Amino acid sequence: MFIISSKNMLQKAQHAGYAVPAFNIHNLETLQVVVETAAEMRSPLIVAGTPGTFSYAGMGNIVAIAGDLAREYNLPLAIHLDHHESLADIESKVMAGIRSVMIDGSHFPFEENVALVKSVVDFCHRYDTSVEAELGRLGGIEDDLVVDSKDALYTNPQQAREFVARTGIDSLAVAIGTAHGMYAAEPKLDFERLAEIRALVDIPLVLHGASGLPESDIRQAISLGVCKVNVATELKIAFSDALKEYFLQNPKANDPRHYMQPAKQAMKEVVRKVIHVCGCEGQL
C-alpha cells in the first residue's frame, strides 16, 4: 500500500528528532516534483492539498497520480487534506482513500473547536486515518482565506494539553508567530511558548507557515518538538517566477513540455532545501 497514514511517519520523526515536510501541490507538475525529489533523497513525504486544490485538480486525479508515482518510485506517501473545515467533506475523501487529514476549527471558540475535531477523530480513526487539528490562528492567506494579523492568536499551552486530551488528535498544529504566505519582515517566533507546549503535549507538533522562515528557526522548532513542516507559498513563487522568466526569454514558446521544465527545476531546488533543513534525507 503506497498511500498511507501520516501517523507512524510523524511518530518516527518525533522519536528520531527530524521533521517530515508537507508540500502543497496544485497540479501534475508540482506533484511530480515533490514525489521525484523525495524519492531521490529517500525522504518521507506528505503531499498536501487544500480544498481549493482538490476542487481544481480533482480528488480522483490526485489520488490516482500520486499512487502511480509512489509505486513507480517505491515511495510510500501520505496524501494530506490541508485546512479542511467540513466533516462531510472529510468523510467523502477518507472513503475515497485519503488517510491523513487536517480539520481546521481554529476560527471557532474553544468548545466548538473541540466538538468539531472530536467528531472528525471519531470517524477517521475507524479508517486508520490520522487527524491533525489547529489551536490558535495563523495570520496570512491560505487557499483564498484571509486572516488579518490582529485576528491571529497564539496557542495557549494549557489549552493545548486539554485540547489534545479531549479530542484524541494525532498531531497538533501550533501558532507561535508564523503566518501563511511570505513574510514582509523576519518573524519573531515564540520558542519559549513552543517549549511549554512540548512539555505538556506528547503528540507530534506541526509548524504551518514555514515558507520564507530562516533555516535556523525551522531547525530550532524541530529541536523543540515540531515533526511536520508545511511549505506552500515558497513552492508556488519558485515555480511561477521561473515560468515567467522563461516566457520573457522565449515569448513565442507554446509547448508546455518545454516551458514547464524550468519551473519544475526551480521548485525542485526549494523541495531539496526543505528536506535538508528538516533533517529527513535518508530516513525512509
Swiss-Prot record:
What role does it play? Catalytic subunit of the tagatose-1,6-bisphosphate aldolase GatYZ, which catalyzes the reversible aldol condensation of dihydroxyacetone phosphate (DHAP or glycerone-phosphate) with glyceraldehyde 3-phosphate (G3P) to produce tagatose 1,6-bisphosphate (TBP). Requires GatZ subunit for full activity and stability. Is involved in the catabolism of galactitol.
This chain belongs to which protein, by name?
D-tagatose-1,6-bisphosphate aldolase subunit GatY
Domain of life per record? Bacteria
Q: Which UniProt keywords apply?
A: Galactitol metabolism, Lyase, Metal-binding, Zinc
Residues binding dihydroxyacetone phosphate, per UniProt = G181, G209, A210, S211, N230, V231, A232, T233
Annotated positions binding Zn(2+): H83, H180, H208
Annotated cofactor note: Binds 1 zinc ion per subunit.
Matching NCBIfam families, A to Z?
A: cbbA, PRK09195.1, PRK12737.1, tag_bisphos_ald
Q: Which family does the entry's similarity section mention?
A: Belongs to the class II fructose-bisphosphate aldolase family. TagBP aldolase GatY subfamily.
Residues spanning the signal sequence: none
| EC numbers for this chain | 4.1.2.40
The record's section on InterPro entries has:
Aldolase_TIM, Class_II_FBP_aldolase, FBA_II, TagBP_ald_KbaY/GatY, TagBP_aldolase_GatY
List, separated by semicolons, the cofactors it needs: Zn(2+)
GO molecular function, one example?
zinc ion binding
What is the active site of this protein?
D82
Q: In which pathway does it act?
A: Carbohydrate metabolism; D-tagatose 6-phosphate degradation; D-glyceraldehyde 3-phosphate and glycerone phosphate from D-tagatose 6-phosphate: step 2/2
- Enzyme class, UniProt record, top EC level: lyase
This chain's source organism reads: Salmonella typhimurium (strain LT2 / SGSC1412 / ATCC 700720)
